[in-house]
């Protein structure tokens, strides 16, 4: 789990006079949220906010879904007005990674604005994945993941805009690049601010354990003369390492000695990795590039024409920067999911393009980084983690109709924009969003229920994942509900039918599940690439004419596996998750959410 608590304390009398780091962090975060709340639905003045907010999409279906949701948000005045909001879609064909998406976005900006964008502050949010590790975000996008916060509720987009609210005021024209599924919180001095005003690239850096460093980018900073660490430091960077081994961190002098670090300054996934005298490194999150650097990358992209390999905005752009950068990394493909023949050559071209460009680092010594991109992280942060709950003011019941929630062993359930009967039970550790649950529904612990409608008697086993989608098939409205275990690995794939026994559904051998459902093992059982067979491409989810029938039918197949009792799927039209996303009816899903919103609003006004 990528949960990182980063904190350095100043020594001496200064530390004694200040609030504890966790208090400063909470107050700074709440101030940003209040400021953003004031701007929602208001016309912002030039320079007060971003000139452009751009979101990347993987394909045209995702582009349409994002544009529909942005349109609804603007209509409901949930976002600042007077800002240009865009969705930029990757070109059809080979996957190009977030680096390729960045290049594509630059080209889109040039086409839309010509030379005008050289005076704009631009936020670019990468949200072009299919969220296979958190599938309730697959249909409508990671950047539109609902949070238990705000009225109307915040989604990740609003939270990003809130946390970065101070940036545009202190930024030269250029582009801030970030991802859709992480949260950066930080606290700095009352009269300090983060400046993005240097030429080249500027990145935020956070102190982290060496273990966390192996899954992030790590900065090799130039020596620092000041004996006291401050909340905000501007540092120069010698070179950038992408997901290095601990051995490499030491080899390239990326490791800092403990000094003023305290063990309580780390939390979440770092606790087990740290000792009181732990060494640490500075890891990455978001980065900024000035307009000159952006234009240089754009000229490069227009020269090469079409990309045929995945480029990483962090691994391939940042590793080329700083005086200590060397070309060796271009041949290291150990962190690459799919190795294309052109990848090494493309990396080398990018290296020679960017070599000599400066990499400036803004060190935030009292900061936190949260990644919410998996079912495990999602459940933990929304139901169990008191730190994030305190910092953001997360609630157990957010804009919902539901009785009080009991707490058990520090865990609560989390209900987001849903209507639940008072006799319905939801066990601690579970999240319910955009759903209606009747009086005879019981939800076990550690479940995720999304977009569902259950009025009949139903028991959802612990650790269930249930997410319903509206579909448009042959111009008819249909529904399908994906159901499996929250710990199932949807990305794990095998190459042949004989190996599908290696896949697991709800912790049970997938081959055994097919027997329970009376389904035969044939190539037709899977959609898409027939040499990449996975739960993601398995045609096992029934298509139904109503939302409630869809949920109940999928729950029957889930319970059949749990209880080892037969439930034949032979009579149903079956889809894979991959196909459900192709047929998804975004408009109907938004309408369903809007109906819940209006009903809650009406009942709240009568109370």
From Swiss-Prot:
It is found in: Cytoplasm. Residues 1-21 are annotated as: Disordered. The keyword Ribosomal protein does not apply. It holds the Pfam family Fucose_pyrophosphorylase. One of its GO terms (cellular component) is cytosol. Its main location: cytoplasm. GO terms for molecular function: fucose-1-phosphate guanylyltransferase activity; GTP binding. PANTHER family: FUCOSE-1-PHOSPHATE GUANYLYLTRANSFERASE. This is Fucose-1-phosphate guanylyltransferase.
